[in-house]
A protein has these predicted regions:
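Functional-site microenvironments in short loops/helix caps that host divalent-cation chemistry
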Residues: 1-162, 171-173
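Short, structured beta-strand segments at or near domain termini in extracellular proteins/domains
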Residues: 171-186
């Protein structure tokens, strides 16, 4: 996109070889960093803004199966972004930021993390600052997406790119990324 307010949708396999990920300390966040950022402060909340979610909070697919914490009306794709042309992403800043001032930590697009994916990694990882397994077949994804239900938008929910074709040069309407920056000296 040429408009900075638009959400970047990652074209798998095209960005990584051309980006100097560590230049100036910029990189993808680890899963632990991503989760801390998504919480926006208090631990223990289900979503970045509280324990319930509606279309006023994020861009996602509302499903009645999650009615105990998804209070959206109407159900289905977000009514403001279901325009008939995929992807149904929303502009950056369309929803209120979390406690750290970060937008779209739930919904809109799944975000790549630096960590390799392992479904049981956190059962054996270090308690402080886990960095993910050494290798795996795919990277971890966090945050949910415009086409996913509220269960995927929970701060603790972990995903990976289960479709092997997304590890190649395939474009994808559901994945994106946000950059983190290491503190001086890290």
């Amino acid at each position: 996109f040429t408009d900075a307010a638009k959400t970047l949708v990652y074209r798998t396999g095209q960005v990584a070889p051309t980006v100097a990920w560590r230049a100036g300390g910029y990189r993808l966040p680890t899963e632990a960093e991503w989760e801390k950022a998504a919480r926006g402060g208090p631990a223990g909340l289900r979503f970045p803004h509280g324990d319930t979610i509606t279309h006023a909070d994020a861009n996602f697919y509302s499903d009645a199966a999650y009615a105990n914490y998804d209070f959206s009306d109407p159900r289905g794709y977000h009514p403001d972004y279901d325009e008939g042309a995929l992807p149904y992403t929303s502009p950056v800043g369309a929803f209120a930021p979390n406690g750290y001032g970060l937008h779209d930590m739930a919904g809109n697009i799944l975000e790549w993390c630096w960590d390799w994916w392992s479904g049981d990694y956190y059962s054996t990882s270090p308690y402080l600052d886990p960095r993910g397994p050494e290798t795996a077949s795919s990277r971890a994804l966090r945050g949910g997406a415009w086409r996913l239900d509220a269960g995927y938008l929970r701060v603790v929910d972990r995903n990976n790119n289960r479709n092997p074709s997304y590890n190649g040069g395939t474009s994808n309407r559901y994945f994106g990324f946000r950059v983190a920056r290491s503190a001086a000296g890290e």
